[in-house]
Amino acid sequence: MASLLYFILFLLFVCISYYFTYYPTNKLQAAVMETDRENAIIIQRNDEIPTRTLDTAIFTDASTVASAQIYLYYNSNIGKIIMSLNGKKHTFNLYDDNDIRTLLPILLLSK
């Protein structure tokens, strides 16, 4: 009878040890795990090809205008716009004036 009690207590100890090892047991761990999940989702979205399609005019040089179809993705967390044109990804930082000057004509001339 005593050995059965020891066995049950041992199983209870194993279950409690498993719980404390693999599950968050305080608010900090829970917050960190939630932030890691959100960051993984953002990273996955940034790696995907954007789905918004625009027909726009691209200035290849000062006198030449070419029609093109671009794909846009906007990441509000880091303030970047990712543009895919002819299979190439271009990243524009919304906090950089040169990138904004490059991006505005593309967006204004798009349908």
Swiss-Prot record:
Induction: Expressed in the late phase of the viral replicative cycle. It holds the Pfam family Chordopox_G3. This is Entry-fusion complex protein OPG086. Component of the entry fusion complex (EFC), which consists of 11 proteins. During cell infection, this complex mediates entry of the virion core into the host cytoplasm by a two-step mechanism consisting of lipid mixing of the viral and cellular membranes and subsequent pore formation. GO terms for biological process: fusion of virus membrane with host plasma membrane; symbiont entry into host cell. Residues 22-111 are virion surface. The chain crosses the membrane at residues 1-21.
